[in-house]
Swiss-Prot record:
Belongs to the cytochrome c oxidase subunit 6B (TC 3.D.4.8) family. This protein is one of the nuclear-coded polypeptide chains of cytochrome c oxidase, the terminal oxidase in mitochondrial electron transport. This protein may be one of the heme-binding subunits of the oxidase. Residues 1-61 are annotated as: Disordered. The lineage of its organism: Eukaryota, Viridiplantae, Streptophyta, Embryophyta, Tracheophyta. PROSITE patterns: CHCH. GO terms for cellular component: mitochondrion; respiratory chain complex IV. PANTHER family: CYTOCHROME C OXIDASE SUBUNIT 6B, CYTOCHROME C OXIDASE SUBUNIT 6B-LIKE-RELATED. It comes from Arabidopsis thaliana (Mouse-ear cress). This is Putative cytochrome c oxidase subunit 6b-like. Residues 7-19, 44-61 have a biased composition (Basic and acidic residues). A motif (Cx10C motif) lies at residues 95-106.
Amino acid sequence: MSSAQMDPHDKMRSRDISKVARGQQAPRPAHTPGTVSPPPENEATFRAKRGDSGRETDAAVEERFPVTNETRHCFNRFMQYHKCIEKNGRDANDCNNLRDYVRSICPEELVSKIWLKSGRNKESQGHYQRQYED
């Protein structure tokens, strides 16, 4: 007797091989890489991610990382503000509310950095970078 322990999965594999050798079981097909497709997303998973309304929601607040949460929410609202400007124009009341919200929630250094460097210069040319999407 051997004192080495066998993994139960190895035992099953050895049994399968012996059955195949005796002709009692067909061999398993070889695995071809890249043939595994992701599982289909069910309705419950979709609703959990997007909410009942079907719109995507922000991730839950992580209390361990308050600065990260603040920065992420600041940037998301900043992007919503620019989407509002593209859709409704600069003078829309909803856009002004978002602008005020961005200015109140975001640190002044961050607002000036993303607003002036990435927003105003590239916005006049019709494009700007979007690193994080809602």
